[in-house]
Amino acid sequence: MSLPGSADDEPVRILHTIYDDMDNPWCGGGGAQRAMEINRRLADRHQIKMLVGNYPGAPAKETKNGVQISRIGSALNYPASRLSYSVLASRALLSESFDLWVYNFSAFSPVLAGARNRNRCILEFFHVLAGHALKKRPLVGLPAILIELYTLGSYSRLIGISPSVLNQIRKRVSGKDLNLVYTGVSQSSFDVAGPTKDYILYFGRLDTYTKGLDLLLKAFSRIGTTHPKVRLILAGRGTEKRIGELQTLSSELGIQDRVEILGPVSEQEKQMLFGGALFKCMPSRYEGWGIAAIETGAAGKAVIGTRIPGLVDAIRHEQTGLLIDPESVA
């Protein structure tokens, strides 16, 4: 991949647009973590500025690990935050000074750019949304699908985060400079220890549809008679609305006494959860990679996940875990 930028001995001014933010309660998962981990490693040689989405109580500007972070858009609610981010990030491309633009694409908060800026851009594609857009957000699903197709066809340099996602892209567009950049895990993922306890673990963003948590709860409700002492723990970031949905579904299924929804946890608590789990579940409907599956493997635990792009690369069937058909609760 040949990149636009300054001479080899000069720092490159990199503008990185990504709605996701590690501290964003609406959308702060593995994509945000990946972006920060890469950027902080580049910050000692280059000038990095990230434009991320706004949320309630967020500082407008801050610097982390040498990376400038600007939060733009409305913090009123999630839809307003997404929409206003698209408008202001698109406008920022006209005023910001940069040599290279890294664009983490999201069909629900696209950034519009002219040909000049597209020519100095690397488009990073985490996953192909396709028909899931209509199921997840019916009101904006069709525009999201069209935006995804248009974006794939409009940029020449693309990065995918798993072989299966790159294959999905190849089926939709041709003649692109496609590159694969995996997502790694921290050393702490290998340092997990502790006795195995009595629970199954889900760790990740508490997004009911995307992560298939409704399927997980329904499947868990079926093992009550055969494994009455086994618990299910859900840990990760999520809005009050999403957590409420999961609590309601648990009650409807009659498993509320065996399901614990922790919400966000510290790194130390995360390691303890991984160390004590019987195994981890990832029943996602779509993924780009599945960093939690790699973290689970590093901790020496098995993963049960869905046979979808991303997870088919992150989980080796019958070696590091099991792959099941999507939507399956049997």
Question: Regions from the language model: what does each represent?
Answer:
Residues L139-G160:
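Membrane-proximal helix-turn-helix segments that form the acceptor-binding/catalytic region
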Residues L15, I159, A193-K211, L217-F220, ...:
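Conserved donor-binding/catalytic core segment of Leloir-type glycosyltransferases
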Residues F203, R231-E245:
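Glycosyltransferase donor-sugar binding loop
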Residues I14-L15, L100-V102, G114-A133, I159:
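Active-site proximal beta-strand in glycosyltransferases
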